Amino acid sequence: MKIYYVYIVKCSDNSYYTGFTNDLERRINEHNDGLNSESYTYTRKPVELVFYHEFNDVNQAIRFEKQVKGWSKKKKEAIINDNWDLLQLLSKNRMKD
């Protein structure tokens, strides 16, 4: 069974990048190696993996990645810190950064 990952990395400028992959270690190395000069993380190296979630279904992973990409920085930090209560509160109140 194939496993897919949605991940968040913290960049050197303290911003976050959310991505999707089927090989987490390879993808994080690619971000840090800076192979694509047009990538968001290219000028923000090094990056640090701060969150990931595994999926067995590729479509669920893609939906979750799109959802997280639309979140505020505060929501991303809530999930990174495993603070589901805060995430729920931020979602309910639609608080912005």
Regions found by a protein language model. Name each.
Residues 1-36, 42-52, 56, 63-66, ...:
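GIY-YIG nuclease catalytic motif and its immediate N-terminal context
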Residues 67-79:
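Short arginine-rich
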